């Protein structure tokens, strides 16, 4: 998908490719948070490069800085973690690709809103490789898919399901946290929360839409689309980042 100069986040000057890593297995959330904090600190200090870190988590809920307690509908269902990212409640679990995005926006563009738009563009371009039309909606951060086969909304408009969530944090213009795209998660767990504080809409995944996409398939698309929006990344391979220094 072609990107305009307004939505791309290519570095201003020649830079090393973004480090791109896939974590094997299920990553405990506490360890992921600690690693992100450490890596973001190192990027700010100039002792480490930018990084995109792909993980899956065991089933859990996270609460962003805007989370309302009333949106946690089933507090005893899964572990709940408070986190410093923006947004409200979301679910993470096996079959969902979480991409933690640790980029130095001083080297790109110091514009939070444009950065969120670029993350949405990245997801939309990734989904397009599987002929899925993902769309953004004003006032509903994330990526949405029209579901005309479902009952319409109360106002008669077409039902839409969320397929990807975005929740980021910036500290001195270095980003951490990131995006979560539903490849084949257990969608029933979303019923324990009001996802992202938005009621009245559904949640879907690539497999729920009838596409037998594997996580490996999606990772390839994710990397290709990332390079369209953010520039070059290292060759994709799997490693254990938690055993590496930041």
From Swiss-Prot:
Q: Name one GO cellular component term.
A: cytoplasm
Q: What is its main location?
A: cytoplasm
Q: Where is the active site?
A: 196 (acyl-thioester intermediate)
Which biological processes are named by the entry's GO terms?
A: protein modification process
From the UniProt record, which GO molecular function terms apply?
Answer: lipoyl(octanoyl) transferase activity
The record's Gene3D superfamilies line, in alphabetical order, gives:
Bira Bifunctional Protein, Domain 2
Q: What is its EC number?
A: 2.3.1.181
Residues that bind substrate, according to the entry? 85-92, 165-167, 178-180
> Which UniProt keyword terms apply here?
Acyltransferase, Cytoplasm, Transferase
Q: What class of enzyme is it?
A: transferase
Which reaction does this chain catalyze? octanoyl-[ACP] + L-lysyl-[protein] = N(6)-octanoyl-L-lysyl-[protein] + holo-[ACP] + H(+)
Q: In which pathway does it act?
A: Protein modification; protein lipoylation via endogenous pathway; protein N(6)-(lipoyl)lysine from octanoyl-[acyl-carrier-protein]: step 1/2
Task: Spell out the residues of the site Lowers pKa of active site Cys.
Answer: 162
For this protein, the record's PROSITE patterns field holds:
BPL_LPL_CATALYTIC, LIPB
Q: Please list the residue ranges annotated as the BPL/LPL catalytic domain.
A: 46-234
| Protein's cellular compartments | Cytoplasm
Give the family per the record. Belongs to the LipB family.
Q: HAMAP family of this UniProt entry?
A: LipB (MF_00013)
Misc remark: In the reaction, the free carboxyl group of octanoic acid is attached via an amide linkage to the epsilon-amino group of a specific lysine residue of lipoyl domains of lipoate-dependent enzymes.
The role this protein plays is: Catalyzes the transfer of endogenously produced octanoic acid from octanoyl-acyl-carrier-protein onto the lipoyl domains of lipoate-dependent enzymes. Lipoyl-ACP can also act as a substrate although octanoyl-ACP is likely to be the physiological substrate.
Would you tell me the protein name for this molecule? Octanoyltransferase
Protein species of origin:
Chelativorans sp. (strain BNC1)
Q: What is the lineage of its organism?
A: Bacteria, Pseudomonadati, Pseudomonadota, Alphaproteobacteria, Hyphomicrobiales
